[in-house]
């Protein structure tokens, strides 16, 4: 092996090592993201989803994770203004957790935004919202 080949090989190896290190550093400082699906009317499932979201925030730090709970189908009833989960939804949104209702489900169930909790957001389709988030690299959880 001549000296020129040795130097080129060393430079390539060093460059590859730096690229791997930079990727690892970026991955360790990247914000975590999780989307939770709730499509059941069961208050216990809602409590579990809200507990999961809160636990993730406590473990990773609220500023280091984006959390979105997407409700559709029978699960959307727990996002009504007078639902038994209303106080927990308020706490979650105040903690920075995004809670989203499916507008398709609202239309089928003849619900309007006036019927819903004031702090939630909306997506045209709950399933598509989850698909988009997964496509963006979000972790998916269905309690």
Task: Report the location of each language-model feature.
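N-terminal secretory signal peptides and thylakoid transit peptides that target proteins
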Residues: 1-13
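Secreted/extracellular ectodomain signature
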Residues: 8, 22-143
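Hydrophobic h-region of N-terminal signal peptides that target proteins for export
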Residues: 14-21
């Amino acid at each position: 092996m001549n000296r020129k080949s040795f130097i080129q090989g060393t430079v390539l190896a060093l460059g590859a090592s730096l690229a791997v290190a930079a990727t690892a550093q970026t991955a360790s400082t990247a914000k975590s993201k999780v989307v939770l699906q709730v499509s059941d009317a069961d208050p216990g499932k809602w409590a579990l989803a809200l507990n999961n979201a809160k636990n993730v925030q406590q473990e990773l730090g609220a500023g280091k994770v984006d959390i979105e709970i997407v409700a559709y189908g029978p699960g959307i009833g727990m996002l009504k203004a007078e639902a038994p989960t209303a106080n927990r939804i308020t706490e979650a949104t105040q903690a920075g957790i995004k809670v989203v209702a499916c507008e398709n489900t609202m239309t089928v169930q003849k619900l309007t935004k006036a019927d819903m909790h004031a702090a939630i957001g909306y997506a045209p389709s709950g399933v598509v919202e989850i698909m988009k988030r997964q496509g963006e690299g979000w972790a998916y959880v269905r309690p």
